[in-house]
Amino acid sequence: MNFKKKFILGIFICLCAAFLTAKPAYAIPTVNGGNYTSSTAYDIGGYTDHKSVTGILPAQEICSYFKFTVNADEKIYVRCSHDKSYSNMSVELRDSADYLISKSTRVLDASTLTPFLAVNCDGKKNGQTFYVKVNRGDYDINKPMYFSITLNNRIHSGSGTFSFTGSAVNRGNSSMAYSGVDSSIIKLNLSRESKIPAGAIVKRVSTKSTQSPSQGNVHHILMPESVGNWYTSKVSSATSGSYYISEKDNIPVKQVWQFKYNAKASKRSTMNNVKLNVDWIYDLANTNYKRVL
């Protein structure tokens, strides 16, 4: 199978996948050369997820430029399809003045029907302009090259529930101290949990448990070891806790978590079946641009 047929097959597979997950459909334009400088760049327009254009780099042309805009806080990656015959093909991200930001020659999914190159792009302000430059590399100057450019969201979300080992024991507040008494500490190590994407950051976190005997005036208390600070649950509950933690705190999910609880009752108690519920966000740049489900 020659490279043109493989390219068409690869595009067909990508389009089928895009159709199954698609938002509103749009015609995918084809750009057949002439866009070899930033001033002649093909304008893709504003970023939307999975926005694509098909590119043809004609014989005798060495590069192809595309222009697009992103808004503040949008984090995307530009995906450029590849063929094994395209030796030293590269893709570059450039700023609005055509200065190089990053460049990639690394072929991802090289053994599949849809190998690609990727560069990351982070929007800092609304309507920010970037250029993508596709370079021929060592491929025969007398032959055309076929590829696709796709703009994709990098930030995705997930969630999971994980169980602490053991029981937390509270000796009881026999002195009736106003501040109550903290229990023993139990731990949960998520450092190597394969269900959690690399680089995942906590978006929301909560705990569930069973206290025996059930008491009032109980607060769950949680500590991510990388932070080293204890977070006390927002409200009193013997069975659950939610915390003032968000993605702005930039707390990694994959680490050791510690748990204890505070009780004001005078009698001894234990807390069992302690579970950590985590919602997270993650960047596909940390997972070779693959979703973790």
For the regions a language model picked out, list residue spans one by one.
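Solvent-exposed serine/threonine-rich low-complexity stretches and specific carbohydrate-binding patches
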Residues: 99-112, 164-169, 217-219, 226-242
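Acidic, Ser/Thr/Pro-rich low-complexity intrinsically disordered segments
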Residues: 57-118, 125-128, 135-136, 197-198, ...
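Beta-rich globular "head" domains
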Residues: 183-217
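Edge beta-strands of jelly-roll/beta-sandwich modules across compartments, strongly enriched
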Residues: 66, 136-153, 266-282
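Non-catalytic extracellular/lumenal accessory regions of secreted precursors
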Residues: 25-64, 72-74, 152-185, 289-293
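Beta-sandwich interaction modules
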Residues: 109-125, 236-253
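Sec-dependent N-terminal signal peptides of Gram-positive bacterial secreted proteins and lipoproteins
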Residues: 2-27
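Noncatalytic modules at the cell exterior or secretory-pathway interfaces
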Residues: 120-140, 248-268
